[in-house]
Every structure is written in C-alpha cells, then in structure tokens.
Amino acid sequence: MIKEETWSVSIQRARAFFREQEDVTEESINCFVYRTCRIALTELKPKGMGIWAAKRIQVRMEGEVADVEHIYHRYFIQFLSTGG
C-alpha cells in the first residue's frame, strides 16, 4: 500500500514525531522505517506569500497495509489534534 499526502506541517516537526516513536528507525534525515513501512518526508515550497506562507511537506508511506495504516493513524492523530 502507498499513502502519499501533503501536510501543512514543518519538516522539523514531522521528523521530531518519527524520532520520538520507539518502534520507528531513522534511516536518513528524511527517511524512516516502521515495520515493513518506509516513510519519506519531502519539504515542499510554502503555499501562499509573505507572512501567510504555510510550510508544507509531502509524506509518503509505503509497505504492508496494516503497517502503513497503523503508523499513519498515529501521525494523523498527532497532527490533527494539534492543529497541524
């Protein structure tokens, strides 16, 4: 399964989230692994201009369905509950 989405979250916050997960391994600065799921973070150009420019990242998760859904759910709840 592949899940690929754009989020209005800074790449630093996304990295910090994955680094805090005890069952996630960091392969490189923007690549993580959870069980069979590979997670790639890509920083995108901000959307908007000036002080209204929102930081954006692309989050790509690829692996077995259960693993992708499990780590995605944890990520989604973290950033949804904090407003991004």
Region annotations inferred by a language model:
Residues 33-53:
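A short, structured beta-strand/loop element
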Residues 4-10, 61-65:
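Short beta-strand-to-loop capping motifs
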Residues 18, 25-27, 43-47:
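Residue-level detector of functional hotspots within protein domains
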Residues 54-84:
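C-terminal structural segments of small proteins and small subunits
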Residues 13, 38-41, 64-71:
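Short, surface-exposed beta-strand/loop "edge" segments at domain boundaries and coil↔beta transitions
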Residues 21-39:
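Surface-exposed, low-hydrophobicity interaction/linker segments
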